[in-house]
């Protein structure tokens, strides 16, 4: 079943058009869709990361949860859905805290970042078949090492540092 996204201009004004996802082509210039990224931290201060399915773009790379907001969905609802789909964690919308936004002109993405501080452990995680193949609970320092070694998506790590900054990454 095709995936559709609502289109926006750079100022997040709706263009009242939908776009069918196609990994082989870029978004039209000056048009954007919303992508959500969720940094999930448990009571022990560990960050949940997942490993992408080998058949997906950037396969076998580690990242935090996230994905595109579907047509008709709010960014917050998209974040709740993506977190559940990729990890099995059921967060209520009020449990996700909006942390910031990064606009990527080249890819036509407006990235919204959320923080989820939840009571979860390894037994709470259920991976999404076809999307994720592994997970780990790690420290920010471990993520930095994984980024340096090419195991963690470097652009995702750089965006995390830009948005979450001193909150979690000041000791790296």
Regions found by a protein language model. Name each.
Residues 14, 59-61, 71, 98-100, ...:
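Nudix hydrolase/Nudix homology domain
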Residues 33-66:
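A glycine-rich, hydrophobic loop/mini-helix early in the fold
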């Amino acid at each position: 079943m095709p995936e559709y996204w609502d289109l926006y201009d750079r100022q997040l004004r709706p263009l009242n058009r939908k776009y069918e996802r196609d990994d082989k082509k870029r978004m039209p210039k000056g048009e954007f869709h919303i992508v959500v990224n969720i940094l999930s931290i448990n009571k022990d201060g560990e960050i949940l990361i997942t490993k992408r399915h080998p058949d997906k773009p950037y396969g076998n790379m580690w990242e935090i949860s996230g994905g595109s907001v579907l047509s008709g969905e709010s960014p917050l609802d998209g974040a709740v859905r993506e977190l559940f789909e990729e990890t099995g964690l059921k967060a209520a919308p009020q449990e996700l805290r909006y942390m910031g936004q990064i606009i990527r002109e080249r890819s036509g993405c407006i990235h919204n970042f959320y923080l989820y501080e939840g009571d979860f452990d390894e037994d709470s995680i259920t991976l999404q078949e076809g999307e994720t193949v592994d997970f780990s609970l790690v420290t920010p320092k471990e993520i930095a090492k994984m980024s340096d070694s090419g195991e963690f998506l470097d652009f995702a790590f750089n965006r995390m540092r830009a948005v979450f900054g001193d909150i979690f990454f000041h000791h790296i």
